[in-house]
């Protein structure tokens, strides 16, 4: 509502076909012109697809929303239950978000559907929603700005690889992008300032998260018993620091 009061116009059920110059062209043929164009359409954002050539690792995920009482504890499961990724159960007020993501290179011939159905079947409750997608897990891309184009959120890889968190990170990126765009239009602040401010505020967290993900990818190759031993007894402090995007070792 605040955006509408400031002059924003929402086009629901509209799909972007491509972006050319200062024009956004929709699938229905209509065109919209803008001084600055922001891509916030997720990892398959059309602006990134057409104007960025940087690739990123994407982990396929499946999840359900299940009704019931699941307590207050968050569950995270690693190892053969979700090869190269993790399975989760996030309690909500009247149910839970239950699902998993995997790296196909670790899956040993089994499909995402097989892993997801096996894990979800461990919980009792009525499923009210089923969803699927993928998470960009390479961390933020190197360049958020090209000319008058900007990327934010998943389109810019603003997901922490070590834990899959992206909502808060995207909100930070969106706030910085909005501030810089406003300053650019009012006093000519370079749009590249968006990247500079992001790196200053979130760069260290993202670098630590990328390191933790690489460390985790090595650990996931271990047998389950060794992985459990590592998580539960030997390096709890290190694992927690990895998940929370802090430096695990002084040498990393």
What residues fall within each predicted segment?
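Short alpha-helical scaffold segments that flank and stabilize functional sites
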Residues: 6, 102, 173-181, 212
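Solvent-exposed, flexible loop/coil residues
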Residues: 36, 70, 80-82, 94, ...
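Hydrophobic transmembrane alpha-helix bundles
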Residues: 44-51, 55, 97-101, 163-173, ...
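Flexible, glycine/charged-enriched surface loops at secondary-structure junctions
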Residues: 125-132, 189-192
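C-terminal helical "tail/cap" subdomain of flavin- and related membrane-associated enzymes
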Residues: 179-252
């Amino acid at each position: 509502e605040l955006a509408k009061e400031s002059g924003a116009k929402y086009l629901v059920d509209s799909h972007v076909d491509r972006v050319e110059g200062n024009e956004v062209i929709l699938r229905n043929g209509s065109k919209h012109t803008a001084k600055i164009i922001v891509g916030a359409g997720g990892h398959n954002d059309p602006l990134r697809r057409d104007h960025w050539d940087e690739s990123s690792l994407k982990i396929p995920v499946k999840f359900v929303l299940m009704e019931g009482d699941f307590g207050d504890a968050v569950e995270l499961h690693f190892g053969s239950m979700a090869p190269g990724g993790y399975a989760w159960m996030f309690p909500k007020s009247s149910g839970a978000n239950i699902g998993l993501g995997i790296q196909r290179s670790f899956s040993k011939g089994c499909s995402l559907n097989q892993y997801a159905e096996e894990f979800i079947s461990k919980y009792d409750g009525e499923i009210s929603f089923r969803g699927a997608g993928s998470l960009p897990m390479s961390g933020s891309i190197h360049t958020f700005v090209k000319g008058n184009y900007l990327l934010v959120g998943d389109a810019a890889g603003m997901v922490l690889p070590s834990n899959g968190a992206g909502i808060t990170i995207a909100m930070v990126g969106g706030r910085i992008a909005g501030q810089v765009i406003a300053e650019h239009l009012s006093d000519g602040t370079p749009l590249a300032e968006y990247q500079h401010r992001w790196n200053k505020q979130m760069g260290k967290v993202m670098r630590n998260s990328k390191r933790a993900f690489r460390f985790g990818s090595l650990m996931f190759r271990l047998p389950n018993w060794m992985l459990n031993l590592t998580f539960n007894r030997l390096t709890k402090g290190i694992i927690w620091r990895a998940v929370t995007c802090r430096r695990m070792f002084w040498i990393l």
